[in-house]
A protein has these predicted regions:
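Short linear functional motifs in flexible/disordered or boundary regions
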Residues: 29-30, 87
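Gly/Ala-rich phosphate-binding loop of Rossmann-like dinucleotide-binding domains
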Residues: 18, 22
């Protein structure tokens, strides 16, 4: 199959890139390739008893897979310039907050909780 766009990685950046492309160009054929396992098969072997620390799995189920490392987080986003990154240094504080709010709106529209 031929694609117009191929995105490598289904972490937040890849997911949002595909989302934005679909909005702007609905007929665009997009493929997202991810090295990790499907969400329902992602499981870290650390159990605290037999396996107490990272064993360097070939594909880390915490880091790799749909949603990236954020798939298993509590889902909180920091909508501030005070901590958590330096995006504002590149696009300005006002635009950074607007972009953070935009991402939050999309997450809420797709089942996120406030």
């Amino acid at each position: 199959m031929k694609y117009d766009v191929i995105i490598i990685g289904a972490g937040p950046g890849g997911i949002f890139a595909a989302y934005e492309l679909m909005k702007k160009k609905p007929d665009c054929k997009i493929a997202v390739f991810e090295e990790g396992y499907p969400l329902e098969k992602r499981k870290c072997p650390i159990d605290g008893e037999k396996v107490k620390s990272c064993i360097n799995c070939k594909r880390c189920s915490i880091m790799c897979g749909f949603g990236g490392a954020g798939a298993f987080s509590d889902g909180k986003y920091n909508i501030t310039n005070d901590f958590g990154g330096t995006l504002f240094e590149y696009i300005g504080k006002k635009q950074a907050v607007e972009l953070m709010k935009y991402v939050d709106e999309i997450n809420m529209e797709n089942g996120g909780e406030g």
